[in-house]
């Protein structure tokens, strides 16, 4: 394999072993893992900016976009193994790994399973050790899913959670983009992945002290389900963890406040690279 710094790679799209991916830019490898119900296109504001400094790899997690389905009852390590296989295919030994929401669970699982392959890990809008009320709500949503796709009321409720209700006028366009992704997600893939997401908030409780690399836990001040308290708790548990809270933002801050999210990510990654 090759070192994380790669040069001479033109932007490209591909599919390997049922995983659809895109690569853009040159430099140290940086991996972007989207959340449940989305696909790699949701990272467009990050890819546009970060490809100037990094070799940015975004991909569709199992059950999403153009990637294959996960197992009927998947585990987090199945999603982590998907990323490991993709990095092998791309000849990337080590990388900075960034996840959002469900993607943060995968990023942390990957960092714990393959620490030698992770220079730094950033968990955006991550869930961790939900309160009983939070857990009951997400488990109820998971139990209501079937393989027939998201009904319009469910999509409306999700957009309201992620953007506020009503959606602020200046966010209407990006909210419609997110709504369209939810409406077209593979229904089986979404249901299988969401059930795992709903039940995995304690997957890293007691394990974060094993994170050897720099770890950033960043969320929005107004995100009720991936709360600032969760990010602070994770940062306190990780030996090299730190929390960043973005003022006035909610769950989809990578598309509602891309400039500040990108700036915080670049600052963190550069500091991690010097550590």
Locate each region found by the language model.
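Conserved HGGG/HGGXW glycine-rich cap/lid loop of the alpha/beta-hydrolase fold
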Residues: 19-72
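Alpha/beta-hydrolase fold catalytic core
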Residues: 1-30, 51-55, 92-93, 202, ...
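Flexible "cap/lid" loop of the alpha/beta hydrolase fold
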Residues: 108, 112-113, 118-149
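Acidic catalytic loop of the alpha/beta-hydrolase fold
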Residues: 221-226
